């Protein structure tokens, strides 16, 4: 079977399974199966697949048809122009989270020597990206999951990003009295009440504790905010990714913060909140 024939067959199966973005999935998984780039697929469409390549592609397509995210099948996802390892132990990095990185870039000069904490680091995409974009930052990252931290540590090592990692339930492992110049987080913020609106591949395959934040999506955030306040220096910044339905409740929780603002994503949906701890 040629590359084109294999692609066309896979596309039909993915469409029949009502897979989101079937053409993209077919391409990504064919590149994965052949260990090639997209240009290769278009340059050699009549090239015959080997038996091993065909078997690998068939298995990948079958997994995708059952809802498994393509990123878990390939083990990779791009974030802010860098390749990150992913596994079912971590939330898949999303383009929306890049708005948090952009918000940090708007606040901080590249040469700052700030101490920064990433809470709930998951794959480490935020922490490692900040360490690369701000080489003088001292970045610490925490997560409750040891399995997630293994992925995060591997990503930092691959990218040569200097990050200190700790297992921690929110900020519980941070020393009393230790304070940071900035704390960032992409906490679980989807409400259980919204579960019927969440894609099957997210509900069935991504870590539940990294997606859902209680009935209304606020349980973790309500615990997180006072801990962040305690561990931020006066004048320090807090940036957090949020969902479209919780901007107002988050604003209420952060009513004592200054410089509060909500940063929308490209669709105009509230995506990142920014607040500053008063200097006095």
Curated annotation (Swiss-Prot):
Asked if the keyword Methyltransferase belongs to this entry, the reply reads yes
Protein name from the UniProt record: Release factor glutamine methyltransferase
Query: Which terms are listed as keywords in the entry?
Result: Methyltransferase, S-adenosyl-L-methionine, Transferase
Protein function: Methylates the class 1 translation termination release factors RF1/PrfA and RF2/PrfB on the glutamine residue of the universally conserved GGQ motif.
Tell me which EC number(s) this protein carries: 2.1.1.297
What family does the database annotate?
Answer: Belongs to the protein N5-glutamine methyltransferase family. PrmC subfamily.
Specify the enzyme's EC class, one word: transferase
Question: Organism, per UniProt?
Answer: Koribacter versatilis (strain Ellin345)
What is the gene name?
prmC
Residue sites binding substrate per the record: 186-189
For this UniProt entry, the molecular function terms from Gene Ontology, in alphabetical order, are: nucleic acid binding; protein-(glutamine-N5) methyltransferase activity; protein-glutamine N-methyltransferase activity
- For this entry, list what GO says about its biological process: methylation
Q: Which residues form the signal peptide?
A: none
Q: Does the keyword Transferase apply?
A: yes
In the record, what lineage is assigned to the organism producing the protein? Bacteria, Pseudomonadati, Acidobacteriota, Terriglobia, Terriglobales
What reaction does this enzyme carry out catalytically?
L-glutaminyl-[peptide chain release factor] + S-adenosyl-L-methionine = N(5)-methyl-L-glutaminyl-[peptide chain release factor] + S-adenosyl-L-homocysteine + H(+)
